[in-house]
Curated annotation (Swiss-Prot):
Keywords: Methyltransferase, S-adenosyl-L-methionine, Transferase, tRNA processing. This is tRNA wybutosine-synthesizing protein 4. Pathway: tRNA modification; wybutosine-tRNA(Phe) biosynthesis. The lineage of its organism: Eukaryota, Fungi, Dikarya, Ascomycota, Pezizomycotina. The gene is PPM2. It comes from the Eukaryota.
Length: 1021
């Protein structure tokens, strides 16, 4: 019976899949070329010949590929250099692609290679391309010797043969074809053969991959080196799900990973298929193993490029294994996961409620704090951190109690950063310490958030810049203890500091044992009643040390602040191994409920700790109790506590944010909100203790931006409210009167003007009829209950409404706002009332006294709003604002107030809530001018005068006319809104950027010294 011939459709599908798998080679080789160029500057480079253009990869990808390459290289080196008398050594690279293992091995190990033969096997099309590059590149063809065999037939599987290197074009599923080809030029059963499969057989269907593994075990004296993905916590773990989606999107799904998802299942896979000795490591174990690299080699990597993506690197390494199997028995116990931490013996059960995204922006590696409003509302504030594209200069504000009013925070504060800490100082303030921009730019500035006013004040700078440090409040005091952290790309702080709100930073003298210097550790302060005045105690654990390994020690600390120089004393935790699963973690967050401390997430030395674990710790004196907090078993429903924010409220924890870059496969963002009820845990751990909880109801409010102060010192300034000047009202007699107003550059309200019939006619019904009920308009819909719109935090959304629906909602005071755009070309041309709303145009006119406005008009804008506050901003062009219907309160500030109004560099809008701030000391250094506009009033707003508006009535209708009051100097190019800054300013910003970059190579303090001097020169010009 003849074998059925595959259908052409099936063959085409198979070929298409094969082509996609071959495509994965290109990305991998570009990454390996990046590693080769950066990390091996003193070696000959071979990947370069297979990559048309060098692309520097991100540090995370570089380090991950470096580890992959090192793992393979070590096993190949061991094979090559181990004596095997009477047997020729053969290295067969299965799915070799454009890999350069033969050339690297002969270059690195020279004579040790002896007569080792390297054979690359992959799809015929890919091997033919590789053959052409090898033959056409002298640096590669040199390995072939003088007379290599080169096949001439398309059907040949042996494409290239020489004494040291061969190429075979063969589908790895065709084992009989592969065997015949190899045996045609090589007595396999007389050889020592090492098969290498680096992320290749995982693309094969599992049956074919297993058949290949079993077949290989019978080839001579065989060894096998496998490197591929695993799913240690299942397919729903955030890293795993991102990885699987990535390969599925490429149509190159990982096949065997579901059947062999763990280290042990991979070991069993090989043991059942003829391999007598099997060693398996996940790549994090390989990173820690002296088999693959030593401490000095790990540390040296930091000198190549700054690196701080440790959580993401560990997650990557936990999801890959390197396996070394031999068909003969080697003796000894299999290497790999042998020294696991003791499993947790004590469990406590928590109740968790997960909520999908509440609309907050994506944020990770920020730091949380709990703030209060004057009305007593409680709020989780997730400060700064990393967003989708850059570090963020904003904070997410969540209410954590039902019916909370909005939290108003002053907008001046710390700059964008990650890896900082925020700590509640008890009855005092909230302290923000350090952080970084890039790993090469650590910050030493510190800030306090005043609980009474929710305003930031700059406080004492750290003695050294720090990020990835630990900070704890010393219970019952307004002091904070800072431990460890990094001061730069590779420098770890060995110092301990006390923050004193009056004396500043105090360096501690150290006694007792000397802890390893670490960063990313966690610290706990004990609240035991035995603490004496001025004496405090706690625990320090986890973090990464100078060798690039997670610290395997924990320490009890005691601090004495009663002496002039504080003293910190350390003692080792004696039963560490019993609790190492909870203590050997990096990047964990801590939160306290009563005397219990909860260590949340991070990644650990134990394989169980991959961002979804939680432990409950109790520290009292030199005793430590540890319990695993059971959150459930479904990884897809658990919070991903990597770069997340955790706070406590009563007996509950609230967790927001978090995420990780999953190597080269995309970024996972946890946008959920998690409430973890620990009331049962508290009752179990602290008998007789009951916590009376207020219900925790989490609601996202907004994400206000923070701007940096323009001068040094503590904020706010003078302790008095700003004096408000009433804007004068006048009547014009002639055109020249208005020209004088323009030249004087001061705001005025002009009364008694003939604006046409608009003031009498433009009620809701008339406007709807004139514009058209069904005409669609795009309006701002405020997302907060206060109606206070903020352009920077975008706390509004753009919605398309019929004009009738919009007017109805605005008339009843809903927080909607229409700023009309050009009807024909909204992205290209400025608004023009006559063209955009012809049904209304005849009712509105500018009187003769404002003839110069008509002559130099840039745009005329219809503005209609309900009860929505317009954000503080300035316009580059002068304008007249005519109130047609309703009433509005407007507050203006002169251009000289720019440094006091929280405008970020280059921004024309501020997040400062003027109408709230006027009742506080916050605007004491400003000069506010106020206008109440009624129908028929016209407000002249000079260029660069900052202004904001608040409705007095439910509905407001106005026409705003912008005009050029300068003869020249405006920016060229498209300017729909008329708010592009003057050309001289835009050019000046470019010049400043160039000047700033010219100081980049200088030490931070010298750089700041000279930049401040240049700033002084600008101010004195």
């Amino acid at each position: 019976m003849t074998k059925e011939k595959p259908s052409s459709t099936r063959v085409a599908k198979t070929q298409a899949l094969d082509d996609l798998i071959m495509g994965t080679n290109s990305s991998s080789i570009v990454s390996k070329r990046s590693v080769e160029r950066l990390y091996y500057p003193n070696e000959l480079h071979f990947f370069r010949y297979f990559v048309n253009k060098f692309q520097r990869r991100a540090p995370l990808i570089n380090r991950g590929y470096w580890l992959r390459l090192r793992a393979i290289d070590v096993i190949v080196r061991q094979f090559i250099t181990t004596p095997e008398p009477g047997r020729r050594k053969v290295v067969i690279n299965l799915g070799a692609g454009s890999d350069v293992l033969p050339w690297q091995s002969y270059h690195r190990y020279g004579d040790s290679c002896g007569d080792t033969l390297f054979i690359d096997v992959d799809y015929p099309d890919l091997m033919r391309k590789k053959r052409a590059i090898v033959l056409g590149t002298p640096q590669l063809s040199e390995l072939l010797g003088e007379d290599p065999y080169v096949s001439e037939k398309e059907t040949d599987h042996l494409l290239l043969r020489s004494d040291k290197y061969c190429q075979v074009g063969c589908d790895l599923r065709e084992l009989e074809t592969l065997r015949k080809c190899l045996e045609s030029f090589l007595p396999l059963f007389e050889c020592s053969v090492l098969f290498v499969a680096e992320v290749s057989v995982t693309y094969m269907d599992t049956i074919s991959a297993d058949a290949l593994i079993q077949w290989a075990s019978y080839i001579g004296q065989a060894e096998f080196c496998l490197l591929e993905q695993i799913l240690p916590h299942g397919p729903d773990h955030p890293f795993a799900s991102t990885m699987l989606k990535h390969f599925n999107k490429l149509n190159t799904s990982l096949k065997s990973v579901h059947q062999y998802p763990t280290v042990n299942s991979q070991r069993s896979r090989f043991e059942k298929r003829g391999w007598n000795s099997v060693d398996v490591w996940d790549l994090w174990e390989a990173w820690n193993s002296e088999v693959f690299l030593n401490s000095s080699e790990r540390a040296a990597l930091d000198d190549v490029e700054p690196f701080d993506e440790w959580e993401e690197f560990i997650l990557f390494a936990r999801h890959y294994i390197v396996l070394h199997a031999t068909s003969y028995h080697r003796g000894g116990k299999g290497a790999g996961q042998q020294m696991l931490a003791s499993p947790p013996g004590k469990h406590v059960k928590a109740n968790m409620v997960a909520t999908k995204s509440l609309g907050a922006p994506k944020r990770r590696f920020g730091s949380p704090l709990v703030a209060s409003s004057p009305e007593g509302g409680q709020y989780l504030v997730h400060t700064l951190g990393m967003g989708i594209n850059a570090r963020l200069d904003s904070c997410d504000i969540y209410s954590i109690q039902e019916s909370s009013t909005s939290l108003e925070m002053a907008p001046v504060g710390p700059s964008a950063r990650i890896c900082h800490t925020t700590t509640d100082l008890g009855q005092g303030d909230l302290l923000l310490v350090g952080g970084r921009a890039s790993p090469s730019k650590a910050f030493s500035d510190c800030w306090v958030l005043k609980k009474s006013s929710n305003s930031w004040e700059k406080t004492f700078d750290l003695p050294v810049p720090l990020f990835r440090h630990s900070t704890v409040n010393l219970p019952g005091s307004s002091l904070a203890l800072v431990l460890g952290g990094k001061t730069g790309p590779s420098e770890i702080s060995s110092d301990y500091f006390i923050f004193h709100p009056v004396r500043g930073w105090l360096k501690c003298a150290v006694s007792g044992v000397s802890p390893n210097s670490t960063f990313g550790a966690f610290a706990i302060a004990s609240t035991s009643l035995g603490s004496k005045n001025g004496h405090f105690e706690g625990l320090l654990a986890g973090g990464i040390d100078g060798e690039g390994k997670i610290n395997n020690q924990a320490y009890f600390w005691t601090v004495d602040v009663t002496t002039h120089e504080p003293i910190i004393h350390f003692e080792s935790v004696q039963n560490y191994d019993q609790h190492s699963w909870a203590l050997s973690v990096f990047g964990a967050q801590t939160a306290n409920i009563e005397s219990l401390s909860f260590v949340c997430g991070g990644v650990g030395q134990d394989p169980s700790s991959q961002g979804q674990s939680m432990a409950c710790l109790t520290v009292k004196g030199k005793s430590l109790a540890v319990h695993l907090v059971d959150l459930g078993e479904k990884a897809g429903q658990l919070p991903f506590m990597v770069g997340s924010a955790t706070v406590s409220s009563g007996s509950q924890l609230v967790i927001v944010g978090g995420g990780a870059t999953c190597f080269s496969m995309g970024t996972f963002w946890d946008t959920g909100v998690y409430k973890i009820d620990l009331e049962g845990v508290v009752s179990e751990m602290i008998p007789g203790r009951t916590i009376h909880n207020k219900p925790v109801v989490v609601g996202y409010q907004n994400s206000p931006k923070l701007t940096q102060p323009t001068t040094d010192g503590v904020y706010p300034g003078p302790q008095s409210n700003a004096f408000i000047t009433a804007i004068p009202k006048i009547k014009l007699q002639s055109k020249s009167d208005f020209e004088k107003l323009v030249q004087n550059r001061k705001p005025v309200i002009i009364e008694g003007l003939d604006l046409g019939g608009c003031v009498e006619k433009w009620n809701s019904e008339y406007v709807i009829q004139s514009v058209g009920e069904t005409k669609e308009v795009v309006v701002h819909e405020c997302q907060t209950s206060t109606g206070k719109m903020d352009f920077n935090s975008k706390n509004f959304r753009y919605v398309t409404e019929s004009f009738s629906s919009f007017m109805t909602k605005a008339a009843r005071g809903e927080a909607l706002y229409l700023r009309a755009l050009s009807e024909e070309k909204p992205t290209e041309a400025p608004a023009n009332l006559a063209e955009d709303f012809p049904g209304l145009a005849d009712d509105f006119r500018l009187p003769e006294e404002l003839g110069s406005v008509k002559d130099r008009m840039f745009s005329s804008v219809l503005r209609i709003s309900g009860r929505a506050n317009m954000w503080l901003h300035y316009d580059v062009m002068a304008n007249v604002y005519t109130q047609i219907q309703g009433s509005k309160r407007m507050v203006l500030f002169p251009p000289t107030d720019v440094s006091h109004l929280a405008f970020a560099p280059g921004a024309s809008s501020s997040s400062l809530d003027i109408f709230s701030a006027l009742d506080t000391h916050q605007l004491a250094s400003t000069n506010p001018h106020e206008a109440f506009l009624n129908p028929g009033d016209l407000l002249f707003i000079p260029a660069m005068w900052f202004h904001t508006a608040s409705p007095v009535t439910d509905l407001s209708v106005a026409v705003n006319v912008f005009f050029r009051d300068l003869e020249s100097g405006y920016s060229t190019g498209r300017d729909v809104y008329g708010n592009r800054d003057l050309a001289a300013y835009e050019k000046g910003r470019q010049d400043i950027s160039r000047i700033t970059k010219s100081f980049d190579r200088l030490p931070s303090e010298i750089r700041q010294f000279y930049l401040r001097r240049l700033a002084d020169e600008l101010l004195h010009e």
